[in-house]
């Protein structure tokens, strides 16, 4: 036997074919959500309050400080919040201090700042009773970006942008005449020297000394028509504020507020880190030739002579001196924007490609500490210097699709940004109130208006593009949704503008973002999934783990480092499948490795790191596809996406051929019930499990508290599937922390179970599986193999209207006793009743105003003399296709203290459950992107059968394999058959699973034929088929696209107001559109009457369709069609353009067009006849 046995959870053993031992456990898969939110509660909120504190009034007399904050206990538990449709939130209280500087009076108060939504343990938020997920956003990191451009004459130039987290942009660019320009905040461009003069380097000589003499600088100085700091400031002011009278003071304060005011300009931690990294002098001198001798100013020791090339060794040696004191200069700008000296660090080097000894200055931004969050003059000078250096080929341009330049904004940061908006709006209100109110009687509570804060938080959770309704179809969908990375959303890209480069797979995605899992369609590449081992660091960059190789011994250690994409660029990384000795030494001299996106073969001495696992490349969903390495990537993408659409089945089954990811995915998804403390199971019921804790006391283990774990039973999920939890432990079991106590939906024995293992044959059968169609045995219907449970929620509310309140009642006008048989005395359906389309769920009547009666009604009243009842029937009925069994009814009353929206007195919710068996038209799929629709369900006796008499379950078309290149399904089929014979489950991890020889070995072990095929017999005749057929066990899932949801028919229904044509779509109960191509088809057949009928009485000939209905009811001939309404609309349109359009008949008489309204009750009596007949019934 090949492979080794591995235990997954308490109940499942699998034979694993993995050859590579796992060094690192998979991390908690929803950590990206939980840890980010925790950071927000612990630090993010505090940062926010520190940012705006203190708020001072315009005179500087009153000062309001935020000292501390605390979150209280939530009012309801998570389950109660879902039940009552409220938000799961805790009250936020802030301790505020108000200081009056004149009197020295200090007032402290605790101020309530609204309810703050809390994250549940599973990484979701409950907002208005619905579970939502905040998706992480991929954005460009704030930093300095340099990029090359080629103009229309083929001349190479450069552009650079300084992008802050928030604030004005600075852009540099060259033009065809080799002049360097700057744009401030997207305005018209100025020569870059104008900005330098404005910073206080007024004369040409100062600028030349600073940047070194070169032709680009002299061209720019020629173009620059200012010659002093004052003129430069006025020039910039005119560009930024055209039309206002410029003064030097205004110009200074404008530039200070644009760039040097921390409230207006913010680089954030990450921006400061990236800018220091890019502009620091040590990173720019690598491999350059010095044009000056470096001397230690303290000792006079020569560290590097002129002409030395600074390789990594030399650079490492002089690094401490670079950090400390070499090349530091203090520039003293005169009269510029910023007062005080500017620290710079400047070193001269020779330009790499100049034949002459051209000297260029490299200016670094000195050592700016991490807490300076705004840009400094030193940064601006260093960024300009880098730009000039780039023109002489010193330095690199940036690739903006590299993951070192894109970062994640997770929940915490998105919330923080939103909270900041609310707080700054509040700050404005506080300032205004400080100046208006009486200074003596003022209190913090009276100053603070919390409305803007609450509103901005509500807006974020309720309507932000990144706050999404959780995809709860199955546990995998839930897990993937929480790990999703979106490049869309506020501050991100838009679908229309995103080009190919952004969407493409980039080498830096390796181990960080899955190259396979992304939607098909307009969002491809913009929405991604986090790789299985990836983590997010404090700056929001995605890191992936690598095993360190000891540089001294060359052995691969067990030490794991998490590297960002930037850091990885400096190292050579070996693949996870390189063969190692037991000590960790590479067995071969030459190693296949990766370096900056190149695959290289290199000597083992050069290796710095090694991958931790073959599955670190792919995401959780992709890692659930066995034999992924044998599938074409396009099909693997479909396979990963379709697993998320699997409907939870009534009795699910985990795959015989799995990958070992099933257990981890199910456990971390949040669908299972997880044990929180070690202990022993005391009691197991359908609705709860009791665990008695074990506690350590003085080295003895004793029994402690009792934990009660509640199960969710038959709850409706967000997608209308059935969410149900079943215990899998027994009384007396000893459980550990983190163990699964109960399966959720689509789980079996603690493992993900999206579908069923069925017997599949690759063969055609009378053409019924043409074009990916699927033929299925009736056994799967009878035995409820693919039966799923669906729960739909319907609600009816009784409101206050102008004419009086609506009433929920059993007493409904014009409804017979038969229709009311399932309603209780309140008029609400009873639990357990079976309902069909159109049945009453909640009886409700609405008061009716006294309306004008029509002619018929007046006639009726004259004949029968009955008073019109002043209520109309607005009951809730079962919609089309919604029939089933009433699972539950919930009633909320204002009198009972339930929170209801304004104007609503009573709310009734009815839950209808449907049991859907698999049927023709349902969509099914395997895990390899092999999807199809069921075309025929054959009786069991007609299905082909194996030599031992077993009929097969499903027939797939063999032609679906070669062109799609997803060979994984064939390997899964054979291995699954062998595993079924051996009675085992199998784990074949991605990129490290069963090889071809393993599959054949297992087939042999199971005693199958050596071609793994079998003879099949035709169920109809009993004759064997001509050729041997591949038959085996494949894992097939039923997808959420079910024919019951899509089938729809209409006889009469609503019409559009303007065109009077039937509405479209199932939701509107619309008709089928007979489009222009269909019209051509009828024209081609010459079916004139059919065509006329379709264009008139079946659609928008208003009078005609009423008469046709009458004629059909009375059994007369259908009358001649009239003029369709849309034709009248066309004529009105032309008349509105001032054309005189008339309609003439064949004998040149004008046809009178009457509007439908003035068509006074055509033949009232006729109509009355019909009406009276229908009412009699």
UniProtKB/Swiss-Prot annotation:
It comes from Bacillus cereus (strain ATCC 14579 / DSM 31 / CCUG 7414 / JCM 2152 / NBRC 15305 / NCIMB 9373 / NCTC 2599 / NRRL B-3711). CDD domains: RNA_pol_B_RPB2. Residues 1147-1161 have a biased composition (Acidic residues). It is an enzyme of class 2 (transferase). The keyword Transcription applies. It catalyses: RNA(n) + a ribonucleoside 5'-triphosphate = RNA(n+1) + diphosphate. Its EC number is 2.7.7.6. The lineage of its organism: Bacteria, Bacillati, Bacillota, Bacilli, Bacillales. The gene is rpoB. This is DNA-directed RNA polymerase subunit beta. Residues 1147-1177 are annotated as: Disordered.
């Amino acid at each position: 036997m090949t492979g080794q046995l591995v235990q997954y959870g308490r109940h499942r053993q699998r034979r694993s074919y993995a050859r590579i031992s796992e060094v690192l456990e998979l991390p908690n898969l929803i950590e990206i959500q939980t840890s980010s939110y925790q950071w927000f509660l612990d630090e993010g909120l505090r940062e926010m309050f520190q940012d705006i504190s203190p708020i001072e009034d315009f005179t500087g007399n009153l000062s309001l400080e935020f000292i501390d904050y605390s979150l209280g206990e939530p009012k309801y538990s998570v389950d109660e919040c879902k039940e009552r449709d409220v938000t799961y939130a805790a009250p936020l209280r802030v301790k505020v201090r108000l200081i009056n500087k004149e009197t020295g009076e200090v007032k402290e108060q605790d101020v309530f700042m609204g309810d703050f939504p809390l994250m549940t343990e599973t990484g979701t938020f409950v907002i208005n009773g619905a579970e939502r997920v905040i998706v992480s956003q991929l954005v460009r990191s704030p930093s300095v970006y340099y990029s090359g451009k080629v103009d229309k004459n083929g001349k190479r130039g450069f552009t650079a942008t300084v992008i802050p987290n928030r604030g004005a942009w600075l852009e540099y660019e060259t033009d065809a005449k080799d002049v360097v320009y700057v744009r401030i905040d997207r305005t018209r461009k100025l020569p870059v020297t104008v900005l330098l003069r404005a910073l206080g380097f007024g004369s040409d000589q100062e600028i030349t000394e600073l940047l070194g003499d070169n032709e680009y600088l002299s061209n720019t100085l020629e173009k620059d028509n200012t010659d002093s700091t004052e003129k430069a400031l006025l020039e910039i002011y005119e560009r930024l504020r055209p039309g206002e009278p410029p003064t030097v003071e205004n110009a200074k304060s404008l530039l200070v507020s644009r760039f040097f005011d921390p409230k207006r300009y913010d680089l954030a931690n990450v921006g400061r880190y990236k800018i220091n990294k890019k502009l620091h002098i040590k990173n720019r001198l690598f491999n350059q030739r010095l044009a000056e001798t470096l001397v230690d100013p303290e000792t006079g020791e020569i560290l590097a002579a002129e002409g030395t090339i600074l390789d990594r060794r030399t650079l490492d040696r002089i690094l401490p001196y670079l950090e400390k004191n070499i090349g530091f200069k203090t520039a003293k700008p005169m009269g510029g924007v910023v007062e005080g000296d500017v620290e710079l660090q400047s070193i001269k080097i020779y330009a790499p490609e100049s034949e002459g000894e051209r000297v260029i200055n490299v200016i670094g931004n000195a050592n700016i500490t991490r807490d300076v969050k705004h840009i400094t003059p030193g940064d601006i000078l260093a960024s300009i210097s880098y730009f000039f250096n780039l023109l002489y080929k010193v330095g690199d341009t940036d690739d903006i699709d590299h993951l070192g330049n894109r970062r994640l904004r997770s929940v915490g940061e998105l919330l923080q940004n939103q909270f900041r908006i609310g707080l700054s709006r509040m700050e404005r209100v506080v300032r205004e109130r400080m100046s208006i109110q009486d200074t003596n009687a003022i209190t913090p509570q009276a100053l603070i208006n919390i409305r803007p804060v609450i509103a901005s938080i509500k807006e974020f959770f309720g309507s932000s593009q990144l706050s999404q309704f959780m995809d709860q179809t199955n546990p995998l969908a839930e897990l993937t949704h929480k790990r999703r990375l979106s490049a869309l959303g506020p501050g991100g890209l838009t679908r229309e503008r995103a080009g190919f480069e952004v969407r493409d797979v980039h080498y830096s995605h390796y181990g960080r973002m899955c190259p396979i899992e992304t939607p098909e369609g307009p969002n491809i590449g913009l929405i991604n999934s986090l790789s299985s081992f990836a983590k997010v660091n404090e700056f929001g960059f995605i890191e992936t783990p690598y095993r360190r190789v000891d540089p001294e011994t060359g052995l691969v250690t067990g030490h794991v480092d998490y590297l960002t994409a930037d850091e990885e660029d400096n190292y050579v990384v070996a693949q996870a499948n390189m063969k190692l000795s037991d000590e960790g030494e590479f067995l071969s001299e030459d190693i296949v490795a990766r370096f900056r996106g190149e695959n290289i073969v290199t000597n083992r001495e050069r290796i710095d790191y090694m991958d931790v696992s073959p599955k670190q490349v792919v995401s959780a969903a992709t890692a659930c596809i066995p034999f992924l390495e044998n599938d074409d990537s396009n099909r693997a993408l479909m396979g990963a996406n379709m697993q998320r659409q699997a409907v939870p089945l009534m009795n699910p089954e985990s795959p015989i051929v799995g990958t070992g990811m099933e257990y981890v995915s199910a456990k971390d998804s949040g669908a299972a019930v997880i044990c929180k403390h070690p202990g022993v199971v005391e009691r197991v019921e359908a609705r709860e499990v009791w665990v008695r804790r074990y506690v350590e006391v003085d080295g003895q283990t004793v029994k402690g508290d009792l934990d009660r774990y509640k199960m969710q039973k038959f709850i409706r999920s967000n997608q209308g599937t059935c969410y149900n939890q079943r215990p899998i432990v027994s009384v007396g079991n000893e459980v550990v922390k983190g163990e699964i106590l109960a399966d959720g939906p689509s789980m079996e024995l603690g493992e993900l179970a999206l579908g069923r293992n069925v017997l599949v044959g690759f063969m055609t059968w009378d053409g019924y599986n043409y074009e990916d169609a699927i033929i299925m045995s009736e056994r799967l219907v009878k035995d409820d193999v693919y039966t799923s449970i669906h729960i739909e929620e319907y609600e009816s509310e009784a409101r206050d209207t102008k004419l009086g309140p609506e009433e929920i009642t059993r007493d409904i006008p014009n409804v017979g006793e038969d229709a009311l048989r399932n309603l209780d005395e309140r008029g609400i359906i009873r639990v357990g009743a079976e309902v069909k389309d159109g049945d009453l769920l909640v009886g409700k009547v609405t008061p009716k105003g006294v309306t004008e009666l029509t002619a018929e009604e007046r006639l009726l009243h004259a004949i029968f003399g009955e008073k019109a009842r002043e209520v109309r029937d607005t009951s809730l009925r079962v919609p089309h296709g919604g029939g089933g069994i009433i699972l539950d009814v919930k009633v909320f009353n204002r009198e009972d203290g339930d929170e209801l929206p304004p104007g609503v007195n009573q709310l009734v919710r009815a839950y209808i459950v449907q049991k859907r068996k698999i049927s023709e038209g349902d969509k099914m799929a395997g895990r390899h992107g092999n999807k199809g629709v069921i075309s025929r369900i054959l009786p069991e006796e007609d299905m082909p059968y194996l030599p031992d008499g077993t009929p097969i379950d499903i027939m797939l078309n063999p032609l679906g394999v070669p062109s799609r290149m997803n060979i994984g399904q064939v390997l899964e089929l054979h291995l699954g058959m062998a595993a079924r014979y051996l009675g085992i489950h199998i784990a074949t991890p991605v990129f490290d699973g069963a090889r071809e020889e393993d599959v054949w070995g297992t087939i042999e072990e199971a005693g199958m034929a050596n071609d793994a095929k079998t003879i099949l017999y035709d169920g109809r005749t009993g004759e064997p088929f001509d050729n041997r057929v591949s038959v085996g066990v494949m894992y097939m899932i039923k997808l959420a696209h079910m024919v019951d949801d899509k089938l729809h028919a209409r006889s009469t229904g609503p019409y559009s107001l303007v065109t009077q044509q039937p509405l479209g779509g199932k939701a509107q109960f619309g008709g089928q559109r007979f489009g222009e191509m269909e019209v051509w088809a009828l024209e081609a057949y010459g079916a004139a009457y059919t065509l006329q009928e379709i264009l008139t009485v079946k659609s928008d000939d208003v009078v005609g369709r009423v008469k046709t209905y009458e004629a059909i009811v009375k059994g007369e001939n259908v009358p001649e069609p009239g003029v369709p309404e849309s034709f009248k609309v066309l004529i009105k349109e032309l008349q509105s353009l001032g054309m005189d359009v008339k309609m003439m008949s064949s004998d040149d008489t004008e046809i009178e067009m009457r509007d439908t309204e003035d068509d006074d009750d055509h033949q009232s009596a006729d109509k009355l006849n019909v009406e009276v007949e229908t009412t009699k019934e």
